[in-house]
C-alpha cells in the first residue's frame, strides 16, 4: 500500500488552492518554506446607456448619451506556499475597477489572507480573511467565471468586503469525497462598523460571531480548490448540490417589540452541473436560491435567485445568466438579465468575454403593484484576461 506523506499532500493542497493558475515557483533555498506567485489582469471596455439619471460614477454620460469607459476590472498579485511542512498560506493583493470613470485613486487591498493547517488529505483548518460560504457561487473564482459579473450583487451579507470577512473555518471532503463541508465562525456585524452606528439598539450587542457554512453532495466528481470555477474547461464532469445558512444574533436591521434588533438569518440551496462532452464540448448549468432575513420591512430582507447556462464548442461558448433579488420593501431590489460570448484562447488563462446586460440596481422591479418600475440600465462589456 502506498501512503501519501504530509509534504506530498501539502504540496498538492497548495496547487489546488491556486485554483488552476499557472503559479510560478520561487526557489527559497530550504524545504521548510515554499513560495509560488501568480497574477491576474482583466482589462474591460464598458459601454453604458439608459437607466436612472447619470451620476459622477455610474450610469450614462452626463449628457444622457452613451458612456464609454476603459479600465482595469482587476489587477491582482498572489503568493502561496507551505511552511514547516505542516502549514499552508495564501495571500492576494488586488486593485478593482482601477481607472473606472477616470478614477485612478482606487486603493489596492488585501483580497484574501488564508493561514491553513492540513491534518489529513482533503481536510483543511483555516483562518484569516476568508470567502464566506453560503452557496457554491458565493465562493466562486473571479478569474474562472462563466459570466462576466459574479453573484455578489444579491449576496447581502453583513459587514463584508467582496464576500470576505475574518473567520475560522473547516473545509474538507468526507466519505470517499462524496460530501463537502465548509463553514465556521466569522466576524459578521459589529456595532459601529459595516454601516452600523454605535447607538442603541446596538448591532450584535453581545459581540457574538456569525455562524455560517454549507454542505454539498458530490454526484459526479469533486472539487478541492479554495474557490470554484463557473466552468472548468478541463475535460472532466462535475455535478453537485448543496445547502447553506448564516445566523447572527441581533444583527439585523429591524427593531423588535423589546427594543432590540432582529437576528440576521440567511438560507441557500444550489445545484451545479458541468458536463464534459465528446469532441471538446462542455455544458454548464448553475442554479441557486436565497432567503435573506434582516427583520420585517428591512431593505435587505427578501428572496433572491441566480442562474447561468452555457455550451462550449472548443474555444467558443455562448452563455446566458440572470440575477434577481426582490426586497420586501419592493424599492431595494436587483435584477440583471444578460447573455454573451466567451472565447477561450488558453482556457481561463487567456480569454475574451463579451456580454450584454440589462440591470435594475437597488430599485423597483417590473410588475410591482403600486410601485413605478426603475428603468433598465443597458451595458455592453468586453473583457480581456491574462492569468499566469
Task: Give residue spans per PLM region.
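Bacterial N-terminal signal peptides that target proteins for export
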Residues: 1-10
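N-terminal signal peptide c-region/cleavage motif recognized by signal peptidases
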Residues: 18-20
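Outer membrane beta-barrel
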Residues: 24-191, 205-223, 301-337, 357, ...
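Detector for outer-membrane/organellar transmembrane beta-barrel domains
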Residues: 30, 206-208, 216-328, 335-338, ...
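Flexible, solvent-exposed loop segments that connect beta-strands
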Residues: 52-64, 196-198, 253-260, 297, ...
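Acidic/Ser/Thr-rich, low-complexity mid-to-C-terminal regulatory regions of eukaryotic proteins
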Residues: 184-186, 196-200
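Outer-membrane beta-barrel "beta-signal"
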Residues: 210-219, 374-388
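Predominantly the C-terminal beta-signal and adjacent terminal strand-loop region
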Residues: 348-382
Amino acid at each position: 500500500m502506498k501512503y501519501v506523506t504530509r509534504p506530498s499532500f501539502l504540496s498538492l493542497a497548495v496547487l489546488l488552492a491556486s485554483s488552476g493558475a499557472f503559479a510560478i515557483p520561487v526557489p527559497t533555498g530550504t524545504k521548510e518554506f515554499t513560495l509560488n506567485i501568480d497574477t491576474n489582469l482583466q482589462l474591460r471596455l464598458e459601454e453604458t446607456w439608459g437607466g436612472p439619471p447619470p451620476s459622477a460614477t455610474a450610469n450614462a454620460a452626463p449628457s444622457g448619451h452613451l458612456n464609454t469607459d476603459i479600465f482595469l476590472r482587476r489587477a491582482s498579485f498572489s503568493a502561496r506556499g507551505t511552511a514547516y511542512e505542516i502549514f499552508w498560506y495564501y495571500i492576494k493583493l488586488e486593485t478593482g475597477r482601477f481607472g473606472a470613470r477616470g478614477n485612478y485613486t482606487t486603493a489596492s487591498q488585501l483580497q484574501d489572507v488564508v493561514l491553513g493547517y492540513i491534518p489529513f488529505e482533503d481536510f483543511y483548518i483555516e483562518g484569516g480573511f476568508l470567502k464566506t460560504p453560503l452557496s457554491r457561487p458565493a465562493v466562486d473564482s473571479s478569474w474562472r467565471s462563466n459570466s462576466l459579473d459574479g453573484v455578489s450583487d444579491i449576496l447581502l451579507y453583513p459587514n463584508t468586503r467582496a464576500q470576505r470577512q475574518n473567520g475560522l473555518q473547516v473545509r474538507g471532503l468526507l466519505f470517499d469525497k462524496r460530501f463537502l463541508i465548509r463553514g465556521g465562525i466569522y466576524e459578521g456585524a459589529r456595532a459601529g462598523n459595516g454601516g452600523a452606528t454605535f447607538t442603541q439598539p446596538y448591532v450584535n450587542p453581545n459581540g457574538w460571531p456569525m455562524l455560517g457554512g454549507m454542505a454539498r453532495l458530490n454526484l459526479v466528481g469533486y472539487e478541492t480548490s479554495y474557490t470554484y470555477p463557473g466552468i472548468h474547461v478541463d475535460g472532466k464532469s462535475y455535478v453537485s448540490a448543496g445547502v447553506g445558512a448564516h445566523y447572527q444574533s441581533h444583527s439585523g436591521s429591524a427593531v423588535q417589540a423589546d427594543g432590540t434588533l432582529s437576528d440576521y438569518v440567511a438560507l441557500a440551496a444550489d445545484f451545479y452541473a458541468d458536463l464534459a462532452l465528446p469532441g471538446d464540448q462542455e455544458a454548464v448549468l448553475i442554479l441557486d436560491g436565497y432567503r435573506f432575513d434582516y427583520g420585517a420591512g428591512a431593505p435587505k430582507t427578501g428572496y433572491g435567485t441566480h442562474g447561468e447556462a452555457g455550451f462550449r464548442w472548443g474555444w467558443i461558448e455562448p452563455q446566458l445568466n440572470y440575477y434577481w433579488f426582490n426586497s420586501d420593501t419592493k424599492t431595494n431590489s436587483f435584477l440583471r438579465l444578460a447573455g454573451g460570448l466567451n472565447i477561450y484562447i488558453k482556457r481561463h488563462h487567456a480569454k475574451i468575454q463579451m456580454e450584454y446586460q440589462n440591470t435594475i440596481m437597488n430599485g423597483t422591479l417590473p410588475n410591482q403593484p403600486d410601485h413605478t418600475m426603475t428603468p433598465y440600465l443597458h451595458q455592453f462589456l468586453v473583457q480581456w484576461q491574462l492569468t499566469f
